[in-house]
């Protein structure tokens, strides 16, 4: 296995819901921090083989290509692969783990990785609109709230923290 080194790290500020970053695209934020991280690393963009980013809540159509948009926007080659991962709260960390594995296995000599999310821009989904809401009300689903609720009926994820915290073993 190849050794892995972190050459640089950057991040944006953590914004509050509906705060000063609410109108910022996760792609634009990702490009800004990736460009800065590459600049600090001392590597040229053509020396970076792969980009991996975590993202859960798409805020616009191009977010389906968020990793590709970030890497190309940060100056990486069009030919460099990009991968988006969704592991809910752990997506950014999973991106870093996956990039580490690429380098360890020799599938990349250098990679960029991170997460890009603007929950304030989480949209609403109206399933009936695809084929037409013919008569009656069309239900809307808050995709941000959907991402914060356990799909197996256990409730809001923040509530789950309060449930699990008292039951974890004391170290």
Each predicted region: which residue ranges?
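Phosphate/pyrophosphate-binding loops at sites that engage ATP/ADP/AMP, CoA/4′-phosphopantetheine
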Residues: 37-47, 168
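Short catalytic helix/loop segments, enriched in acidic residues and glycine
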Residues: 21-39, 137
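Condensing-enzyme catalytic core mediating Claisen C-C bond formation in acyl metabolism
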Residues: 1-24, 36
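Flexible glycine-/small-residue-enriched beta->alpha junction loops
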Residues: 110-160
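Conserved catalytic cysteine-centered active-site region
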Residues: 24, 55-110, 140, 148-157
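Acidic, glycine-rich active-site loops and adjacent beta-strand->loop/helix elements
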Residues: 10-13, 54-58, 87-91, 115-125
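Single conserved hydrophobic/aromatic residue that forms the stacking wall/gate
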Residues: 162, 166-171
């Amino acid at each position: 296995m190849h050794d892995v080194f972190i050459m640089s790290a950057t991040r944006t500020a953590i914004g509050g819901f509906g705060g000063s970053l609410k109108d910022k695209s996760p792609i634009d934020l990702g490009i800004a921090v990736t460009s800065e991280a590459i600049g600090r690393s001392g590597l040229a963009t053509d020396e970076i083989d792969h980009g991996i980013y975590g993202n859960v809540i798409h805020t616009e159509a191009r977010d389906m290509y968020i990793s590709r948009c970030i890497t190309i926007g940060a100056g990486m080659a069009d030919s460099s692969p990009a991968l988006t991962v969704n592991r809910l709260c752990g997506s950014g960390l999973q991106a870093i783990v996956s990039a580490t594995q690429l380098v360890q296995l020799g599938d990349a000599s250098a990679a960029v990785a991170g997460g890009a999310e603007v929950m304030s821009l989480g949209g609403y989904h109206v399933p009936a609109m695809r084929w037409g809401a013919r008569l009656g009300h069309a239900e809307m689903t808050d995709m941000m709230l959907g991402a914060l609720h356990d799909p197996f009926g256990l409730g809001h994820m923040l509530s789950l923290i309060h449930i699990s915290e008292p039951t974890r073993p004391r170290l």
